[in-house]
Amino acid sequence: MKTFVICSGGLDSVSLAHKVAVEKTLAGLISFDYGQRHKKELDFARACAQRLDVRHMIIDIRAVGEGLAGSALTDEIDVPNGHYAEDTMRITVVPNRNAIMLAIAFGVAAAQNADAVATAVHGGDHFIYPDCRPGFIEAFQAMQAQALDGYAKIALYAPYVNLSKANIVSDGVRHRTPFEATWSCYKGGKHHCGRCGTCVERREAFDLAGVTDPTTYEDAAFWREAVARKAG
């Protein structure tokens, strides 16, 4: 199955790219520049494409991103520290981000005679991000079936949608994902901050999976405090 992977350069999407490269036919990686503060993630997506020897498209939607104001990922708003499950992390929502990216990726896949588009949304995202939930995935697939009716049949492949990030780490190990060559931090500094929601979730996932985390964090201990606070 000829499949394009939406790849941010993060742990989840890079692991998915390696999975697709082994289990299907990887047609290429599609990344998006939407004005995100952690734009350095795109360098990791580019490196992934080079490593897997496939085409990499970086699609510039910064003009769209300018209209999606109010998120800590795009505006000069402090990225909150803490676990993803905390309500404070809602400030990191970019409205309709996945729907916009998927719609573009489906268009590319149809034009390139591909069979599927893969996205790395996962169970850990459900609390904060509505466009990462199973209902959204099912509805988007149904919408695209109508949008491309008579032109192309493109499947939406979301193998992690009901899995945890720890499950993704385990899957990444099976498919030899080089975790050190992935970027998760929303703050986009020299190293992972270790304090934002995605850093905390990343560190916790390695711990739960029983896999050594190769990541350098500016604050390597904070995640335990954040996880304990979440637990109660």
From Swiss-Prot:
MF (Gene Ontology): ATP binding; ligase activity, forming carbon-nitrogen bonds; zinc ion binding
Highest taxon of the lineage: Bacteria
Protein name: 7-cyano-7-deazaguanine synthase
Co-factor(s): Zn(2+)
Species name: Chelativorans sp. (strain BNC1)
Residues reported to bind ATP: 7-17
Catalytic reaction annotation: 7-carboxy-7-deazaguanine + NH4(+) + ATP = 7-cyano-7-deazaguanine + ADP + phosphate + H2O + H(+)
Cofactor binding mode and count: Binds 1 zinc ion per subunit.
Protein family according to the UniProt entry: Belongs to the QueC family.
Pathway: Purine metabolism; 7-cyano-7-deazaguanine biosynthesis
Entry keyword annotation includes Zinc: yes
Protein purpose: Catalyzes the ATP-dependent conversion of 7-carboxy-7-deazaguanine (CDG) to 7-cyano-7-deazaguanine (preQ(0)).
EC numbers for this chain: 6.3.4.20
Binding site for Zn(2+): 185, 193, 196, 199
Annotated GO biological process: queuosine biosynthetic process
Keyword set, alphabetical order: ATP-binding, Ligase, Metal-binding, Nucleotide-binding, Queuosine biosynthesis, Zinc
InterPro entries named in the record: QueC, Rossmann-like_a/b/a_fold
Coiled coil regions in record: none
Broad EC category: ligase
Signal peptide per UniProt: none
Pfam families documented for this protein: QueC
